[in-house]
Amino acid sequence: MNKIMKNCLLGGLMAIAMHGLAQAEKADSTKPTMIEADQGTADDVKQTRTLTGNVILTRGTLMMKAGRALVTEDPQGYQFVTFWAKPGALATFRQKRDGPGDLWVEGEAERIEYDNKSEIAKLFSKAKLTRLDGRKPTDEVEGAFISYEGRKELFTGHNQDEGGSKPGGGRVKMVIQPGPAAPAPVPSP
């Protein structure tokens, strides 16, 4: 099999495997966005807010934490937030997923961009996403860049910090845990 065919097959398998790995709780989209920080500055003319020191954003079950954040708002009132980790740390997010049980998705990176209109989180540099059932990891993705689309139940990983992929530029790592074990067959009498 030639290299192009292998890359296409690998990309297709990766997209299929990642589809359904994460689904944001739908009720979160109707909740207000709350942001707390040690210090904040607002510019109503430019529709920007700058927050520094222990920044915490919550929206329903979504919680994002970082050292610094910049919030911009479009004319329709939707917010776009960029989070930067404090030195030596990573910015984080955690959100409940729809479905039965205690299902969550968690992510971390040096920078996270969150668009509350599209409900897309982009993780840049040292990016990691984990799907959890309670506290037990069920799936993990690591890479230089990860995009998490809550509405589409999709996340994708790339080997370049700004979202592209190139040969020799690093690897994306996925760990998919096995499903529950099938019950042992009942011996016939």
Regions found by a protein language model. Give the residues of each.
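Mature-chain termini and adjacent capping regions
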Residues: 1-189
